[in-house]
Regions:
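C-terminal edge and immediately downstream basic/flexible tail or linker adjoining helix-turn-helix-like DNA-binding
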Residues: 3, 7, 144-147, 161-179
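Sigma70-family region 2
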Residues: 9, 49-64, 84-85
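Short, charged helix-capping/linker segments at alpha-helix termini
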Residues: 9-18, 28-47, 145, 150, ...
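Short helix-capping/turn signature of helix-turn-helix
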Residues: 22-25, 33-34, 130-137
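Residues within the DNA-recognition helix of helix-turn-helix
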Residues: 23, 156-159, 163
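Arg/Lys-rich amphipathic alpha helix in sigma70-family domain 2
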Residues: 57-60, 71-91, 159
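Internal acidic/polar
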Residues: 79, 87-112, 116, 138
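Helix-turn-helix DNA-binding module
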Residues: 116-127, 135-152, 163-166
Length: 179
């Protein structure tokens, strides 16, 4: 991907398009942790891509491209959230038509199960879980993206895992009562 980024920095529009196609689904998943409306997410991704394209020549470290784009997206999500979504949101069901076109059935089931588990978590916990488990970023890398202390990232991960365990245990207890 670094080679494509360097080409895009030199003005190659096709290289930029290839990069976007590689990271678009990841950006969607990250935006979905904060914004529930698919149209808003599409607009945010488009705005992020426009801003990325305008400023790609300023990027000094091509290996940090994805982190840079995620930072831009998160900032845009936070601005929209403050402006439009004042109350706490939960994650909606996916717009399945769009999603099914882009992903295999197994991926869809895995992602829906994952989102179902995290939908009631606080935003900070959701975004850290997504970045850590789905994007496989290290705690250190996440702290740089979100501009928070590494220990805060660890705390969010711990609390998120504990809440998920608690919710799973409660669901098991309900199932036992029904049986």
């Amino acid at each position: 991907m670094e080679e494509l980024i360097k080409k895009a920095q030199n003005g190659d529009k096709n290289a930029f398009t290839d990069i976007i196609l590689q990271i678009r689904n990841d950006l969607y998943k990250i935006a979905k942790t904060r914004i529930s409306n698919d149209d808003d997410i599409e607009d945010l991704i488009q705005d992020t891509m426009i801003e990325t394209y305008k400023h790609i020549k300023k990027l000094r470290e091509p290996d940090k491209f994805k982190m840079w784009v995620i930072k831009i997206l998160i900032n845009k999500c936070n601005k929209l959230y403050k402006k439009k979504y004042r109350k706490d949101i939960s994650i909606d069901e996916y717009n399945l038509e769009k999603y099914i076109i882009l992903n295999s059935q197994k991926d869809i089931e895995d992602d829906l199960n994952f989102y179902h588990l995290i939908k009631d978590l606080k935003y900070e916990e959701r975004i850290v879980l997504i970045l850590h488990y789905m994007e496989q970023y290290s705690v250190k890398y996440i702290s740089k993206i979100l501009k928070i202390n590494e220990n805060t990232v660890k705390t969010h991960l711990y609390r998120a895992r504990e809440r998920i365990k608690k919710n799973l245990n409660e669901k098991e207890e309900v199932l036992e009562w029904k049986i």
